[in-house]
């Protein structure tokens, strides 16, 4: 039975997979994201997030036990917000998140997520596929008090673009165009397509990784 491994610490990505019938093994990736971004100074946004996703999945593969790597698919993802031609990652501080919201309030931007799925059999890589997906997010304009309160929760500090769709930040999203799971950090339609390329059935994954 094929084990699903999620190479991410994101509670949002974990929730998406759980709600879709899969309880993955979580192995948090350990890569230097800044170095990877710096190595792609002129690359298009989709290539940057895909490179990050590939690095994360590849790093996780190296740390799997023999039993976990016997029959598995390893998922790596990375999301960034494309606004005014610039990729925005996790703000990391209240001040940075506040500046981000000042820039994007009342505007639209694209949340771009890179996906990588690596297929393992008997500890060997037998498939490696990638894809990116974009969803347009139309932001509302939170009042100064609401924004301050939101920033104080800490939620937007460690997520791409300083917002969540599936959390408190959802109050300040007017609408989206595209796949909502992509905004949360892992697109189910993209994953399904990647699994199909690897000849892996979603139904089989439900059976092997069901909650």
Swiss-Prot record:
GO cellular component: cytoplasm
Keywords, ordered alphabetically: Cytoplasm, Hydrolase, Nucleotide metabolism
CDD domains reported in the protein's UniProt record: Maf
Pfam families documented for this protein: Maf
InterPro entries referenced in this protein's UniProt entry, alphabetically: ITPase-like_fam, Maf-like
Keyword Glycosyltransferase among UniProt keywords: no
E.C. number(s) listed in UniProt: 3.6.1.9
Subcellular location: Cytoplasm
Active site location: 78
Keyword Iron-sulfur among UniProt keywords: no
Family: Belongs to the Maf family.
Role this protein plays: Nucleoside triphosphate pyrophosphatase. May have a dual role in cell division arrest and in preventing the incorporation of modified nucleotides into cellular nucleic acids.
The protein's name in its UniProt record: Nucleoside triphosphate pyrophosphatase
Species of the source: Mycolicibacterium smegmatis (strain ATCC 700084 / mc(2)155)
């Amino acid at each position: 039975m094929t084990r699903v491994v999620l190479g991410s610490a994101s509670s949002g990505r974990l929730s998406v997979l759980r709600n879709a019938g899969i309880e993955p093994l979580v192995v948090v990736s350990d890569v230097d994201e800044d170095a990877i971004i710096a190595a792609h100074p002129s690359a298009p946004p989709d290539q940057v997030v895909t490179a990050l996703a590939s690095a994360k999945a590849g790093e996780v593969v190296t740390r799997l036990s023999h039993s976990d790597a016997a029959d598995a698919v390893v998922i790596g993802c990375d999301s960034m917000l494309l606004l005014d031609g610039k990729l925005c990652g996790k703000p990391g501080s209240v001040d940075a998140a506040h500046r981000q919201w000042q820039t994007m309030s009342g505007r639209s931007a694209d949340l771009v997520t890179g996906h990588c799925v690596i297929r393992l059999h008997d500890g060997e890589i037998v498939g490696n596929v990638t894809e990116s997906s974009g969803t347009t997010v139309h932001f509302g304009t939170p009042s100064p008090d609401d924004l301050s309160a939101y920033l104080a929760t800490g939620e937007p500090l460690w997520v791409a673009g300083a917002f969540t769709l599936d959390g408190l930040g959802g109050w300040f999203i007017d609408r989206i165009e595209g796949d909502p799971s992509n905004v949360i950090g892992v697109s189910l339609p993209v994953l399904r397509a990647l699994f199909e390329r690897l000849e892996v059935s979603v139904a089989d994954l439900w059976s092997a990784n069901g909650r």
